[in-house]
Amino acid sequence: MKHAVKHIHFVGVGGAGMSGIAEILHNLGYTVSGSDQADGAVTRRLAELGIRIFVGHDAAHIAGAQAVVTSTAVKGDNPEVIAARAARIPVVPRAVMLAELMRLKSGIAIAGTHGKTTTTSLVTSVLAEAGLDPTFVIGGKLNSAGANSALGKGDYIVVEADESDASFLNLLPVLSVITNIDADHMDTYGHDFARLKQAFVEFLHKMPFYGAAILCGDDPGVRSIIPMISRPVITYGLGEDVQVRAVDVVALPGGQMRFTCQRRNGTVLPDLEITLNLPGVHSVRNALATIAVATELELPDAPIVSALAKFSGVGRRFQRWGDWPCAAGGEFTLIDDYGHHPVEMAAVIAAARGAFPGRRLVLAFQPHRYTRTRDCFEDFVKVMGSADAILLTEVYAAGEAPIVAADGRSLTRALRVAGKVDPLFVDDVNELPATIAEQALAGDVVIAMGAGTIGGVPARVVELVKERA
């Protein structure tokens, strides 16, 4: 690739997956440029690295490029895409470029509806702790590295495999993890759950015959595809019939999990006593997937235990913003999370209950996509009803047209009718920081959750609280 193409341009370079690939290609010696609709922390960081960044989209931005990479969010009518095609410059999806990077190393791909980013980060951290210096491309910022990607000198590349547009079928890993399979992004699969599951089977069969499928045995969707897989399978979970199992699971106050890991994959290996620096049973399963990967790679036990104990988290995955003064006295705890599906929401609420027992849980949620709100409406109502207080904003459209009865006000009404919690609807997400800063009570645990613009809310809450002090 290097001999044929020297200048690569990214359209939508500010996206989590795009920016990571752009940075790695830059570090490999390519000339990299990119454009995005708006300037932000990610684009500014890329510019500081020496990557030429354009704000806005214009045909002139692709000048000199020999390949153009597009994110899923970029449409065919983008002027840079149109200009590239007119000039017969190859236009390739992000996943195709990621697949090219994976050809340079032995690839470990983490797939699944939920938990991909955290599991990818955990695997990366364990490999780094073992001295393997992996390359990684993650959908969120790995706090210990301060970035969502890095070019390592070792033999492995660890990547997050995205099923949302079926682009993970471009990847060719040697080890693959599937954390779970839930009904999400169903427009891609014709609203057919069987088609979604078949895509995961195809993904696993992209591995060579000597690859291994590391699968969550606790998840019904994953279990249902095991008979269709013709690669070696390693299962993990909390159930009795898995090969990498957690027993004696205890939630520790403050947000850690303690458990014993039993490994029974053909040979019986020593049990591992794990203290995981993440909250929630869902995090235990992500750690088990990581242990299964590390065991398959025959890594020593010490770096596995050490990396899990000191894992410093991922941006916007149960990310703690600290304890802050309430307007009426006392302090509240502020947490940020990317979760945008009812299953993720339930896991985060359960994790918060375990980490902060007895405290009032306030969920500030910005729904993401009208189609997901429609498809998961009743599940959202049920799960949100398990919080103690709810702040709801309007749906973040992500380019979708509004759908009747699948908006924030409809969710608010449905929650009110259900009667478990009386939600407050905040029409403009920009008003949410002030609402949180003014209304949080002493002892509250406030979780700002969603995949849209709510990601900027915690920082603004902190600013407002500091201004008030």
UniProtKB/Swiss-Prot annotation:
Protein name: UDP-N-acetylmuramate--L-alanine ligase
Subcellular location: Cytoplasm
Family per similarity comment: Belongs to the MurCDEF family.
EC number: 6.3.2.8
GO biological processes: cell division; cell wall organization; peptidoglycan biosynthetic process; regulation of cell shape
Chief location of this protein within or outside the cell: cytoplasm
Function: Cell wall formation.
Keywords, alphabetical: ATP-binding, Cell cycle, Cell division, Cell shape, Cell wall biogenesis/degradation, Cytoplasm, Ligase, Nucleotide-binding, Peptidoglycan synthesis
Pathway: Cell wall biogenesis; peptidoglycan biosynthesis
Positions of transmembrane segments: none
Gene3D superfamilies according to UniProt: Mur ligase, C-terminal domain, Mur-like, catalytic domain, NAD(P)-binding Rossmann-like Domain
Reactions catalysed, as given in the entry: UDP-N-acetyl-alpha-D-muramate + L-alanine + ATP = UDP-N-acetyl-alpha-D-muramoyl-L-alanine + ADP + phosphate + H(+)
Pfam families registered for this protein in UniProt: Mur_ligase, Mur_ligase_C, Mur_ligase_M
Molecular-function GO term, any one: UDP-N-acetylmuramate-L-alanine ligase activity
Keyword Ribonucleoprotein attributed: no
Positions of ATP binding: 112-118
GO CC terms: cytoplasm
